[in-house]
Regions:
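Short acidic low-complexity segments
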Residues: 72-85
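Rossmann-fold NAD(P)-binding glycine/threonine-rich loop
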Residues: 99-169
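A short, basic/flexible loop-to-alpha-helix module at the beginning of a structural domain
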Residues: 1-10, 38
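Redox-cofactor binding/interface segments in oxidoreductases and associated redox assembly factors
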Residues: 84, 90-91, 154
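Glycine-rich phosphate-binding loop and adjoining beta1-alpha1-beta2 segment
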Residues: 33-67
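N-terminal Rossmann-like dinucleotide-binding module
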Residues: 11-44
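Rossmann-fold dinucleotide-binding core
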Residues: 151, 155-226
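Long, compositionally biased stretches enriched for glycine and/or charged residues
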Residues: 197-463
């Protein structure tokens, strides 16, 4: 790469999961809409055909009249080919297939355990991690061997364990994880400012927050707008909308698999005094017992949904059809940013403007009362010198036990996956607050789910 007139040219980005029909398209749009970077994106995917399809789509986006930078998209046949010479590595993969995820999400329902997402914690999150961690061992080793100085951006869930595995295998890796859940809570605060004070068109980025926690279970203990403390306004709003909830935009929780009425957020704030900063579907899965997920009827009372794998399979077919339309020109390309910040973080690391954003990185003291090497979600400063976490301060005493339980479970999940330790795996599985079963029931469910994901497990699990 080289610099010319406040632009960086001849960059190489390796995209692992380059056949993605979601994250990849958004990333391509963001690159095309930014004039300060250009180069090559090497698409690597075990589904080679999907990568070939995205090569066509990516080059169409780059050639669009509204594109303000030029990127060349190519297909890499191997990880080595993709990674060699890379300045940045982006990872967004589906670990396994939706058939395995069907077991992750729905097998526990036979035991009265309902999951709204099933990709981070709970029984489903644990099993997804068992598949994902071996894949990330391979990816980390390849980055170590072929692009040790590249910056690595992860989008895959379970986010915490993906980033934790990368650092465990290659401690000198320069990796961080990006998640947009915090953005959604900042956006909620802009709407509350409109509703309560008539302040319209407040930008999400103007809501300044202190972020602390772990991915999908993050908290704000400070939130301001132009120096104004937003906590009193949020408390008033949460009390007024506790029963009804609050939604904005064109979707609502009854017709969207991802939407919610924010009742879980309001409830958590009134219980604990901090703003829970993720979607209700994610937050619910971290809480003890059956607080929000006792039954489908209880979930409806809290005004969010259980995202079924059947819905995901149908939505995949829609994305496959859209891929075809984009490739053939039946659907015109429209250049528009997707709201993510990955490309902006790249620019900051290249020296094209400092940026503070929430990311998932090793703790290293940012949250004083969580383990040093645990991966946490906090604000960090991005610039030419690298990534420096902002000291978030300790978690409040009433929230710490909720978060710490998952932190230690995640550490044990990593160890169990790396060592194929069935005993540690089972005890970690049973220690999740959503697994409200007796020992025999829990072991039966664990064995069933492990069997259902066996195609992606190291052979030592069957020893």
């Amino acid at each position: 790469m080289y610099y010319e007139d406040n632009r960086v040219k001849d960059l190489k980005v390796a995209y692992i999961g380059g056949g993605s029909r979601g994250w990849a398209w958004g990333f391509m749009m963001d690159l095309a809409a930014d004039a300060q970077m250009e180069g090559t994106v090497a698409l690597y995917d075990i589904d080679h055909e999907a990568a070939e399809h995205n090569e066509i789509i990516g080059n169409k986006i780059s050639a669009h009249p509204d594109a303000v930078s030029h990127w060349k998209y190519t297909v890499a046949d191997t990880l080595q080919q993709a990674l060699t010479g890379a300045d940045f590595v982006v990872i967004s993969i589906l670990p396994g297939t939706f058939d395995e995820m069907e077991s992750d999400v729905h097998a526990p329902e036979a035991y009265g355990i309902y999951q709204s997402v099933g990709d981070t914690v709970g029984a489903g999150g644990f099993m997804r991690a068992m598949r994902t961690i071996p894949m990330y061992v391979t990816i980390a080793e390849a980055i170590r061997d072929y692009s040790p100085n590249a910056w690595v951006i992860n989008y895959t869930n379970p986010m915490t364990l993906c980033v934790r595995t990368l650092y465990h295998v290659f401690p000198k890796i320069k990796a961080f994880g990006c998640c947009h859940e915090v953005f959604g809570t900042q956006t909620l605060l802009t709407h509350i400012l409109d509703e309560e004070l008539g302040l319209k068109d407040v930008a999400r980025q103007d809501i300044k927050v202190n972020v602390k926690g772990i991915n999908h279970f993050t908290w704000f203990d400070k939130a301001t707008y132009k120096g104004m403390d937003l906590f009193p306004i949020y408390r008033k709003f949460a009390e007024e909308h506790y029963e009804s909830g609050y939604e904005y935009g064109d979707t609502n929780w009854m017709n969207s698999s991802f939407a919610c009425a924010n009742r879980v957020k309001f409830d958590l704030f009134l219980r604990y005094g901090c703003i829970a900063a993720a979607g209700d579907r994610h937050l619910a899965e971290f809480m003890p017992g059956k607080t929000y997920l006792e039954s489908p009827e209880a979930v409806r009372e809290w005004k969010f949904g259980l995202t079924t794998v059947a819905w995901r399979k149908n939505e995949l077919q829609e994305r496959l059809a859209r891929s075809r339309r984009l490739r053939t020109g039946e659907e015109p390309i429209e250049i528009k940013p997707d709201g993510e910040e990955g490309h902006l973080l790249m620019k900051a690391l290249l020296g094209l403007g400092d940026l503070v954003s929430n990311v998932n990185i090793p703790n290293h003291g940012a949250i004083a009362n969580l383990p040093w090497d645990a991966v946490v979600e906090v604000n960090a400063l991005f610039n030419r010198q690298g990534v420096q976490s902002v000291n978030a301060g300790p978690l409040p005493a009433n929230i710490l036990p909720l978060v710490a339980r998952h932190v230690y479970n995640q550490e044990n999940t990593l160890t169990a996956a790396l060592t194929c330790d069935r005993t540690l795996g089972l005890t970690t599985f049973m220690n999740d607050p959503q697994v409200t079963l007796n020992w025999n029931q829990g072991k039966e469910l664990f064995d069933t789910m492990l069997h259902n994901t066996r195609a992606y497990l190291p052979k030592e699990w069957n020893a």
